[in-house]
């Protein structure tokens, strides 16, 4: 005898079990939206493998598996992003000789600049990018990049003139 499960049976099963499964999935993730996504993914996975809708233990195990997969994926993504950020920071950060007093002053002055000006200044001087390339990288126009660069230079000049 063949066990035929209709689309309607799956809808009824989902509507009955989803609230409890979302609550179960919620213990693994921070948001209800993530928990709902996990339950939906688990139902799809469960349905594709043609498991019996009566096997609720396996359905909960599938929800747990999907949740743990999501957590592992998020950890791997965070690790990759942190490594990429470190690589970018090392490749774009200006290198100062902190034994040299003038360079130490320059480093301090650059650190005092607003972030928008500092990133343009670093990209222009230390990484030798054009204003067009800077604009593309930061999602701003090249004129805005040039303007921020001018403001940064003016602020540095003002800082050094006042120290003399």
Q: What is each stretch, according to the model?
A:
Residues 77-107, 130:
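Internal acidic/polar
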Residues 37-44, 48, 54-65:
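Structural recognition of an alpha-helix C-terminal capping motif at a helix-to-coil junction
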Residues 1-23, 33, 47, 53, ...:
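A short, charge-rich alpha-helical start-of-domain segment used by transcription regulators
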Residues 68, 138-162:
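DNA-recognition helix of helix-turn-helix
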């Amino acid at each position: 005898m063949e066990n035929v499960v209709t689309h309607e049976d799956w809808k009824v099963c989902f509507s009955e079990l989803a609230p409890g499964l979302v609550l179960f999935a919620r213990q693994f993730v921070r948001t209800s939206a993530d928990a709902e996504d996990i339950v939906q993914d688990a139902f799809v996975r469960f349905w594709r493998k043609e498991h019996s809708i009566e096997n609720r233990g396996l359905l909960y195990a599938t929800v747990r598996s999907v949740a743990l997969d999501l957590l592992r994926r998020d950890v791997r993504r965070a690790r990759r992003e942190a490594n990429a950020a470190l690589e970018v920071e090392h490749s774009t950060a200006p290198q100062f000789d902190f034994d040299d007093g003038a360079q130490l002053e320059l480093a301090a002055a650059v650190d005092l600049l607003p972030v928008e000006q500092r990133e343009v200044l670093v990209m222009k001087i230390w990484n030798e990018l054009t204003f067009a390339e800077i604009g593309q990288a930061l999602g701003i126009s090249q004129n805005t990049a040039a303007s921020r660069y001018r403001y940064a230079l003016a602020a540095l000049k003002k800082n050094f003139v006042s120290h003399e």
